[in-house]
């Protein structure tokens, strides 16, 4: 996460995703309607951990401008692009395991996966 308001184990619904640090042809934005009562979040899909924060002031950030994105990720835009191409709706939930800049030893992946599983199970009820 890039936002100090989010903590390990929080689950959010990504409603907008932008691609960072790529040529203009690949710098796309993807938006989806809200489908849950989870907190809505925006994301930046990156190639390198920490790249979202490093590129916030660059013009290529599109809709974000200099606003701090809530979540940094590496795969979200790829899934969104495939779904757009196939004209298929999708929902993107993301569990927070760490803040950008945290050492890998500080990441709480197991806690995030557990929280995501609980959120998905609650939606099934």
Regions found by a protein language model. Name each.
Residues 1-125:
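Glycine-rich phosphate- or other oxyanion-binding loops that anchor nucleotides, phosphorylated ligands
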């Amino acid at each position: 996460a890039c936002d100090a308001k989010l903590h390990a184990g929080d689950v959010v619904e990504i409603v907008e995703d932008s691609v960072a640090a790529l040529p203009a042809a690949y710098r796309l934005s993807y938006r989806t309607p809200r489908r849950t009562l989870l907190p809505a979040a925006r994301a930046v899909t990156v190639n390198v951990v920490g790249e979202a924060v490093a590129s916030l002031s660059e013009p290529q950030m599109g809709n974000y401008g200099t606003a701090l994105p809530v979540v940094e990720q590496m795969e979200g835009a790829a899934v969104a692009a495939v779904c757009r191409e196939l004209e298929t709706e999708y929902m993107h939930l993301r569990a927070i395991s760490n803040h950008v800049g945290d050492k890998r030893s500080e990441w709480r992946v197991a806690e995030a996966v557990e929280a995501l599983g609980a959120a998905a199970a609650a939606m099934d009820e």
